[in-house]
């Protein structure tokens, strides 16, 4: 946890230190549980982008430590997934892996054993913040899509998915994407989330795959998603995967709608960010190269 003066004045920072949480973000999951009861009756859970482990600590204390017998403890299976290693947590199985790879989803299911899948998937991951709101929102959206795609592989029917989002212009689109797979969808900002922060959390329950949909692990910034969808041989995938990964609305409205004679007015948020960053000498070359890769990928897909 940080040690700035601002942090030290934060009640949740001090409380996290007193109660032994690795980060104040533990209270965000606790508040989500208080509001929605997401941990009730859960025995199998997955924590994506788990490091440093505060959400895994919550799962451990709420699901594992409350068990009274060894048999009850053996039935609880909690898997924490991250590229980085973490200090051990009681009752937590750590898996170092990339959530954008199919092998990670298979490893998670393998650890549950048999035909069992997760009842709950949580993700508090976020990209490095650039300070450019549109860029931060876009990158967080892509991370959320990656988390959603692996959740469709490891969640059992009726399961729950909770993940961080950055609220912005794409929030309504995000709602449409999530409701493809979940009957109940809500956006919640817990009291422990700083008022100045644009973060909130999607709380999705009653997971149900669309008929004919084949779960896939998607990396929106890397994969050719149209080709990926075609390989499944599923007509549903060919319609849904581009929409899920990129917000592709082709064919959903009048093709004449929204046309404008001004090329400047037709620019997307990403194009505005791209032009502004490329013209600004203060941004490091490495950041510009990453942005160019993302921009080229989206132009290729569209």
Curated annotation (Swiss-Prot):
It comes from the Eukaryota. GO terms for cellular component: cytoplasm; cytosol. The keyword Transferase applies. Keywords: Cytoplasm, Methyltransferase, S-adenosyl-L-methionine, Transferase, tRNA processing. The active site is at 164 (proton acceptor). It is an enzyme of class 2 (transferase). One of its GO terms (molecular function) is tRNA (guanine) methyltransferase activity. It catalyses: cytidine(32)/guanosine(34) in tRNA + 2 S-adenosyl-L-methionine = 2'-O-methylcytidine(32)/2'-O-methylguanosine(34) in tRNA + 2 S-adenosyl-L-homocysteine + 2 H(+). This is tRNA (cytidine(32)-2'-O)-methyltransferase. It comes from Drosophila melanogaster. The gene is Trm7-32.
């Amino acid at each position: 946890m940080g040690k700035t003066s601002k942090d030290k004045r934060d009640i949740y920072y001090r409380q996290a230190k007193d109660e032994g949480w690795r980060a104040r973000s533990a209270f965000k999951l606790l508040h989500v549980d208080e509001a929605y009861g997401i941990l009730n009756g859960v025995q199998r859970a997955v924590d994506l982008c788990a490091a440093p482990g505060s959400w895994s600590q919550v799962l451990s204390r709420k699901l594992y430590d409350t068990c009274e017998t060894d048999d009850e403890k053996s039935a609880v299976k909690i898997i924490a997934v991250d590229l980085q290693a973490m200090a051990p947590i009681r009752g937590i199985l750590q898996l170092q892996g990339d959530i954008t790879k199919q092998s990670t989803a298979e490893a998670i299911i393998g650890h549950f054993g048999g035909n069992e899948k997760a009842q709950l998937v949580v993700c508090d991951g976020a990209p490095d913040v650039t300070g450019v709101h549109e860029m931060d929102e876009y990158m967080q959206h892509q991370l959320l899509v990656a988390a959603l795609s692996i959740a469709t592989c490891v969640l059992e029917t009726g399961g729950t998915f909770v993940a961080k989002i950055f609220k912005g212009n794409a929030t309504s689109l995000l709602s449409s994407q999530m409701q493809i797979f979940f009957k109940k969808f809500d956006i919640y900002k817990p009291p422990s989330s700083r008022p100045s922060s644009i973060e909130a959390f999607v709380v999705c329950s009653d997971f149900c795959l669309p008929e004919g949909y084949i779960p896939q692990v998607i990396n929106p910034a890397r994969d050719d998603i149209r080709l990926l969808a075609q390989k499944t041989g599923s007509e549903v995938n060919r319609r849904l995967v581009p929409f899920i990964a990129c917000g592709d609305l082709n064919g959903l409205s009048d093709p004449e709608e929204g046309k404008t004679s001004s090329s400047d007015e037709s620019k997307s948020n990403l194009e505005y960010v791209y032009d502004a960053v490329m013209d600004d000498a203060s941004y490091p070359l490495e950041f510009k190269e990453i942005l160019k890769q993302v921009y080229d990928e989206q132009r290729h897909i569209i």
